[in-house]
Regions:
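Active-site-facing substrate-recognition patch
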Residues: 1-65
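Conserved acidic residues
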Residues: 72, 120, 150
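Short glycine-rich phosphate-binding loop at a beta-alpha junction
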Residues: 68-78, 153
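PRPP-dependent phosphoribosyltransferase catalytic core
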Residues: 2-15, 140-222
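Short, glycine/charge-rich flexible loops or terminal/linker lids adjacent to PRPP-binding catalytic cores
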Residues: 84-123, 131-137
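Conserved hydrophobic/aromatic pocket- or pore-lining residues that grip, position, or stack substrates
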Residues: 32, 74, 96
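Phosphate/pyrophosphate-binding loops at sites that engage ATP/ADP/AMP, CoA/4′-phosphopantetheine
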Residues: 58-71, 139-148
């Protein structure tokens, strides 16, 4: 499955102004990376038409995949991706589970809301992934509670951090997405909505996000 590069999804994301470009100071992700851009998909929450475009594309992509992989449940990770995971679980007529980033209390319910059986095959769904580390951590937490997991699905995969591939490979995981950041940026560039200075800033970031981060006050390794 990997990535389908849906033009309709790209357009929908651009129309809700999901790409936020830093003005004076870079954005700092929770992982510590500094970045000139931040992807915000929350505009889809209240935009029914564009939300439908994205969910239709995701549903069409996932409906055969979950059967082929014999997925038992969909898992949403605490954060802005939870609504998308819940909407897709509903469309796919599948159980939905909610995973907290950190446990609260004791036992399985401290981190997972919803009932999960040992050896259940689950699919993690989120809106965006940058370096994939938080997704890998989430999958490890699920495995510690007895779940079987091989795949992660996101709306947008940055797919520019070189260490992501080894992180995923070492954890026996694969990320699939509707679009990549490069595809989103390519269309944004064509629409000429950003000044040349910002385009160049983002191009420099895309070429070497690790060096860009460390030279702008962020971490320099995963």
């Amino acid at each position: 499955m990997k990535n389908i590069g849906s033009k309709a999804v790209i357009q929908a994301l651009l129309e809700i102004d999901s790409v936020c470009v830093a003005e004076l100071q870079p954005f700092f992700y929770t992982s510590g990376w500094a970045s000139p851009i931040y992807l915000d998909t929350k505009g889809l929450f209240s935009d029914i038409a564009r939300r439908s475009i994205v969910l239709n594309a995701a549903t069409n992509l996932l409906k055969d995949f979950v059967q082929k992989k014999r997925i038992d449940a969909i898992v949403g990770i605490e954060g802005s991706g939870v609504p998308f995971a819940a909407w897709l679980a509903d469309r796919l007529d599948m159980p939905f589970l909610y995973l907290r980033k950190r446990p609260i209390g004791w036992g399985i319910k401290a981190q997972i809301e919803g009932n999960i059986s040992t050896n259940a095959r689950v699919l993690v769904i989120d809106d965006v992934t940058t370096d994939a580390k938080s997704k890998v951590d989430a999958c490890i937490a699920l495995r510690n509670h007895g779940a079987l997991i091989e795949d992660i699905f996101v709306l947008v995969n940055f797919d520019i951090y070189p260490q992501s591939e080894s992180l995923l490979s070492d954890a026996n995981l694969e990320i699939h997405s509707l679009v990549t950041w490069r595809e989103l940026f390519a269309q944004l560039s064509l629409e000429e909505k950003l000044p040349i200075k910002k385009i160049k800033l983002i191009e420099d970031f895309n070429k070497d996000p690790i060096t860009w981060s460390s030279s702008h006050g962020g971490v320099g390794k995963c």
